[in-house]
């Protein structure tokens, strides 16, 4: 009775047919990091393992090139 329908998670990259996640696409990458700068795990975002690895690599590259912050502004 008290249950509610939970929407199924799906990989947006697989649905869109993305070949490679670009480290310069900051608008996409910002959706996958928290306010404190941590990478959001795939069990929360629904990203497949292949794209989660690409995502982590792209975020780390963007951080190294100072396109994304390592931590929040404190």
Curated annotation (Swiss-Prot):
Tell me one GO biological process term.
translation
Q: Which PROSITE patterns match?
A: RIBOSOMAL_S18
Gene Ontology MF term list: small ribosomal subunit rRNA binding; structural constituent of ribosome
Keyword Transmembrane helix assigned to the entry: answer is no
The family database entries (Gene3D superfamilies) matched by this protein are listed as: Ribosomal protein S18
Q: A cellular component term (GO) from this record?
A: cytosolic small ribosomal subunit
Q: Which Pfam families does this UniProt record tie to the protein?
A: Ribosomal_S18
Q: Which UniProt keywords apply?
A: Ribonucleoprotein, Ribosomal protein, RNA-binding, rRNA-binding
Q: Which family does it belong to?
A: Belongs to the bacterial ribosomal protein bS18 family.
Binding partners and assembly:
Part of the 30S ribosomal subunit. Forms a tight heterodimer with protein bS6.
Q: Give the matching HAMAP family.
A: Ribosomal_bS18
Function, in words = Binds as a heterodimer with protein bS6 to the central domain of the 16S rRNA, where it helps stabilize the platform of the 30S subunit.
Q: What is this protein called?
A: Small ribosomal subunit protein bS18
Naturally occurring in which organism (per UniProt): Halorhodospira halophila (strain DSM 244 / SL1) (Ectothiorhodospira halophila (strain DSM 244 / SL1))
Question: What gene, per UniProt, encodes this protein?
Answer: rpsR
């Amino acid at each position: 009775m008290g249950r509610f329908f939970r929407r199924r998670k799906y990989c947006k990259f697989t649905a869109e047919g993305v070949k490679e996640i670009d480290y310069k696409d900051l608008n996409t990458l910002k959706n996958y990091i928290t306010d404190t700068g941590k990478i959001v795990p795939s069990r929360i975002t629904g990203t497949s393992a292949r794209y989660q690895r690409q995502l982590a690599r792209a975020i780390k590259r963007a951080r190294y090139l100072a396109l994304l912050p390592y931590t929040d502004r404190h």
